[in-house]
Amino acid sequence: MENKENSFDVIVVGAGHAGIEAALASAKMGMNTLILNINLDTLGWAPCNPAIGGPAKGVVAREIDALGGVQAKVTDETMINIRMLNTSKGIAVRALRAQIDKYDYSQRMKEILETTDNLILRHGIAKNILVENGKIIGLETELGMKYFAKVVILTTGTFLRGKIFVGRNTFEAGRMGELPANSLTYSLIKEGLEVSRFKTGTPARVRKDSIDFSKFDIQETADEPLAFSYWSQPRVLTKDYPCYLGRTNSKTHEVIRKYIAFSPLYGDVKLIQSIGPRYCPSIEDKVMKFNKDTHQFFLEPESKHSKEIYLNGLSTSLPFEAQIEILKTIPGLENAIIERPAYAVEYDFVNPIQLKHNLETKKIEGLFLAGQINGTSGYEEAAGQGLLAGINAALKIRGEEPFVLDRSEAYLGVLIDDLITKGVDEPYRLLTSRAEYRLLLRHDNAHLRLYKYGYKYGLLSKEQYEQLHRLENLINHQIERLDQIKVSPNQVNDILASKGSSKITQPVHMSELLKRSEISYTDLKHLDEEAVEEKEVIEQIDIHFKYNGYFQRMQDEIAKMKELEKEKIPSDIEYDKINNIAYEAKEKLKKIKPETFGQLLRIPGINPADAINLRIYLKQKDKIR
């Protein structure tokens, strides 16, 4: 029976990276929220690599921060090693990556959940979703408890019918040592959702004092102060927790081939039929698929409170005895003691083409999905989806318009649009190459792009909003000024010569000189009567003038695409009745049900002729809105 004790606005199932952000966003937006997790000691757990960030993913962590999420802030509080990646490359691919203390990170997340208003944390394994007349009304747990809600958000990670593989040994688990959620999948199927399976894997953890680190190349934390969150004070970390680079060799590969018949992936009996992540293959996949003499891997610390070292790049599902033998072939790991074996895990997911852009399922009103249940991989991708699902859950209950980020606004917009429009046939990972406007979606401008949304939805304070609003105004003011300030040859030619830049023969605007790759604002700052000192402002000035031509071309492309996004496609359209559209296109359109012509043109297999014929049909029927 529904009562005050078991009724909520929002229920979040799973307290991993997606679930935490979803629950916090919902609660901060005033929704009475319940979050359930199988194990209350592993909230926000890092079951694979103990790190946040990397190319594209590091930018996502910054975007989450700009929208009012907590992943970046907690990373800053618990990190033990941090570096800026791709500093020698273009600005579009630069990103932070930090090693977190996985125990401190999890504990800090639990503290935040337990001290947030409108939020209750509770143990529970979801068994069934409760649906009436196509609408979610709550769920039932394995203990027989029924909870009622206006919205349910599923963030189930690898726990849906999770199954672990170590060689030919298999057992049911969501993660090593943790119970799976075996019943929930059948409830989703019963309600009409299509469910498939993916697999992922994790490497062995070895004891720190059994490794000879002198045989590996050290990668220390950065010398300059760094932080993910705009609201954190950047700091220089101690050098106590470096990472190391290692390599496999021909002997390693011989051992892998010797045991390959016992692999659940390659053995005579293929125990694993599902697809794994393309960009994070197992070591046996690398050896069997790529003709290389060596493969690199990294040794990464997991915590200040543990001696476990994570072997990033040596993920495997080979038998335990094979794992021991593999390590003995690598100089520095000959005496390594494995504390936790590597394993693969297979799990259920829901193809995300069954979702709307707000992450609500098309078939069940009020049911939202976020994280690995949508076929993605990665903590950052999960956290971003969770945050957006939490915001949209609250907006749905309020009766307000959904919050949908455009592909030109954020990597999170690219992520969601890719999932909804293209679906997944392998675990999805965000890459810079997936973003056609990546030059606009940078690490350095994440907060300037998104802070207004964070404030609009009540996830950033007025003080935070005003701080970033002031910064944005200052940057724009300085850029306008530098377009007006003129400098003479006598003032700048010595500076230009010292930088290997051609001299000028007549006065020019300072902005003209700043377009040169070798000249920075710092070089000319003494000539500016209203010179600024803020590092962030100087960085944005330099980027603006050097890349503005590219920015303008992208903005023109975005304007054209937004015109297509304005053309809505009715949800009740009967594609089978339309002539002159290819059969393959009709099948995809019926399945995905694009909401706009812009989205339609991003569906693989849909050609411009199909779009033109659909537009003609809709105009004839007077259905273009």
From Swiss-Prot:
It is found in: Cytoplasm. Keywords: Cytoplasm, FAD, Flavoprotein, NAD, tRNA processing. SUPFAM superfamilies: FAD/NAD(P)-binding domain. It comes from the Bacteria. One of its GO terms (cellular component) is cytosol. One of its GO terms (biological process) is tRNA methylation. GO terms for molecular function: flavin adenine dinucleotide binding. Its cofactor is FAD. Gene3D superfamilies: FAD/NAD(P)-binding domain, GidA associated domain, C-terminal subdomain, tRNA uridine 5-carboxymethylaminomethyl modification enzyme MnmG/GidA. NAD(+) binds at residues 276-290. NAD-binding protein involved in the addition of a carboxymethylaminomethyl (cmnm) group at the wobble position (U34) of certain tRNAs, forming tRNA-cmnm(5)s(2)U34. PANTHER family: GLUCOSE INHIBITED DIVISION PROTEIN A, PROTEIN MTO1 HOMOLOG, MITOCHONDRIAL. Homodimer. Heterotetramer of two MnmE and two MnmG subunits. HAMAP family: MnmG_GidA (MF_00129). This is tRNA uridine 5-carboxymethylaminomethyl modification enzyme MnmG. It comes from Petrotoga mobilis (strain DSM 10674 / SJ95).
